[in-house]
Amino acid sequence: MTAMSLATLETRLDHRFGDKALLEQALTHRSHGARHNERLEFLGDSVLNFVVAAMLFERYGKLDEGDLSRLRANLVKQASLADIAQRLDLSQYLRLGEGELKSGGFRRPSILADTVEALFGAVFLDAGFEAARRVIVRQYQPVMAHVDPKTLGKDAKTLLQEFLQGRKLALPQYTVVATHGAAHSQQFEVECAIPALEIKIVAPGASRRAAEQSAAKVALEAAQAVLPAARAARKSGKARKTAQLSLPVAVAQEVK
């Protein structure tokens, strides 16, 4: 890992480390050596939860404590942190042991998410709380811009699952239909299928999860459009059937 590549990561974080050793430790998985990032991850997790809680408190004045807690949980969960790692292109900076490298650990959401928290902890130790808060706010601004308080920050896959379960329909099926590019920068294409509604959506993503989320988002929009149309068609069919059944009675009355 070169100083130049670390400088690129620092630019993406918008923080220059006074102690470069902290940055290197934050990027080091336990499989790589004894000086790994788990303690930094523990610290970063606490700082992250506080900063996100403050952001939500200021942004959503009408949400109660329960909704704020659920929204925060969705924003700091593994999947959300892995998305931030993707934006930082963090996989190319990870320091992994040989076994983790061979098994594709640089793409594993749990490792990516833990490293993001470790980076937040490293910034806190390097320059204090305000620096860590600034870095976290910067990384969460794109996330917060798309948060719908009505759905409490749930991702597209969760919303699609709840939508289908609420209508007693089978859960969607996700299938990787194609991969492109080198191992460290693969692009995925994933199909989201809802057989009961005859919906099939294929979407790309920088990771399998990202592609699944993109496909689920479009599939949810399609399902929301299909079901009202299907209900309207059924109602229309029932109305025609009722009219047909009542027609002979009306004719008989006119004959009389």
UniProtKB/Swiss-Prot annotation:
The keyword Transmembrane does not apply. Its cofactor is Mg(2+). The keyword Nuclease applies. It comes from the Bacteria. One of its GO terms (molecular function) is double-stranded RNA binding. Keywords: Cytoplasm, Endonuclease, Hydrolase, Magnesium, Metal-binding, mRNA processing, Nuclease, RNA-binding, rRNA processing, rRNA-binding, tRNA processing. Digests double-stranded RNA. Involved in the processing of primary rRNA transcript to yield the immediate precursors to the large and small rRNAs (23S and 16S). Processes some mRNAs, and tRNAs when they are encoded in the rRNA operon. Processes pre-crRNA and tracrRNA of type II CRISPR loci if present in the organism. Belongs to the ribonuclease III family. This is Ribonuclease 3. It comes from Bordetella pertussis (strain Tohama I / ATCC BAA-589 / NCTC 13251).
